[in-house]
């Protein structure tokens, strides 16, 4: 029954987009603007498959891609098929999963202050902040991640910070801003967005929390919704977050959280809100075109 509801929801959403191919023209211009940002694509196959399911609905949204991860190449292939998806670089300085680690694009020798003894990024925000990281190496590594993204053949529109790490101090934020400016990219949260994340919401409450938030969405700003999706696969069943122990609860775990957020994105209730014009979906491609990178403002 649940699967049937998800399928019906996807059909509703596809019908809505077919009836209004340019940015869902059937939606009211006075409806609150909502920007769905799906983070961590490229992390692994499970996340890539989940993002593709959302992309296949035709729903316009933005994705933040981890170009430091081995699975980013599959993510690139997937995203090239979906013009409804706007792509950003998920600037990474951490590798938080136990037994599944990654390191910098520039390698251990290129940025030695950013890695542990075997060349992986540090597992948590606290560990990174306590380390003797070099800001020059941070800038070189973040630039290398953007350059890898630009070479991928995807249109890259914006950057944001994986785990908030690249914006965790005023000095790190300045580095991230310089990198974005150098490549003419937008920065997520620099367009006056209000921010809501499903990340810490209990699994059973994710859908209701999102629907309630959207029902009360602001009309004086873009409503940014941060989402993390994944399919339930063996690799996701055993994954363990070394940065956020709250995600590793015995009754749920990371996979339950991310599968729950995928089901929320595919729910018939969300599809109906889009179809009926109660919300108007936008992406960072539209915000950059509207405001320009010169019009961005650092969030307060």
Each model region followed by its residue ranges:
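Bacterial N-terminal signal peptides
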Residues: 8-20
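Boundary at the C-terminal end of the N-terminal hydrophobic targeting segment
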Residues: 21-28
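Active-site beta->alpha N-cap acidic-glycine motif
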Residues: 29-98
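Conserved, mostly hydrophobic/aromatic
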Residues: 40, 87, 159, 225, ...
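Acidic (Asp/Glu)-rich catalytic clusters
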Residues: 51-57, 74-86, 103-116, 150-151, ...
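Active-site gating loops and adjacent loop-to-helix segments of metal-dependent hydrolytic enzymes
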Residues: 102-129, 240-253
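Catalytic domains of cell-wall/extracellular-matrix polysaccharide-remodeling enzymes
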Residues: 132-218
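C-terminal domain-boundary segment and adjacent tail
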Residues: 187-190, 245-300
């Amino acid at each position: 029954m649940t699967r049937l509801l998800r399928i019906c929801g996807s059909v509703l959403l596809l019908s809505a987009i077919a009836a209004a191919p340019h940015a869902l023209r059937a939606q009211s211009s006075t409806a609150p603007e909502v920007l769905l940002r799906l983070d961590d694509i490229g992390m692994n196959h499970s996340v890539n498959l989940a993002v593709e399911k959302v992309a296949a609905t035709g729903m316009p949204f933005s994705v933040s891609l981890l170009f430091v991860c081995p699975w980013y190449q599959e993510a690139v292939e997937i995203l090239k098929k979906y013009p409804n998806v706007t792509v950003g670089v998920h600037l990474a300085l951490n590798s938080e999963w136990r037994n599944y680690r990654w390191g910098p694009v520039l390698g251990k020798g290129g940025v030695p202050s950013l890695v542990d003894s075997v060349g992986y990024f540090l597992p948590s925000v606290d560990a990174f902040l306590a380390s003797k990281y070099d800001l020059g190496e941070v800038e070189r590594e973040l630039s290398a991640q953007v350059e890898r993204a630009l070479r991928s053949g995807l249109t890259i529109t914006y950057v944001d910070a994986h785990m908030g790490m690249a914006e965790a101090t005023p000095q790190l934020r300045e580095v991230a801003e310089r990198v974005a400016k150098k490549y003419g990219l937008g920065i997520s949260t620099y367009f006056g967005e209000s921010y809501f994340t499903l990340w810490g919401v209990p699994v059973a409450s994710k859908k209701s929390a999102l629907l309630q938030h959207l029902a009360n969405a602001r009309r004086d700003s873009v409503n940014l919704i941060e989402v993390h999706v994944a399919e339930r696969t063996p690799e996701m069943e055993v994954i363990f977050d070394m940065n956020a122990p709250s995600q590793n609860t015995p009754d749920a775990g990371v996979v339950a959280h991310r599968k729950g957020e995928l089901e929320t994105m595919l729910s018939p209730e969300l599809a109906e809100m889009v179809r009926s014009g109660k919300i108007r979906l936008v992406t960072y491609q539209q915000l950059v075109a509207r405001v320009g990178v010169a019009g961005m403002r650092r969030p307060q």
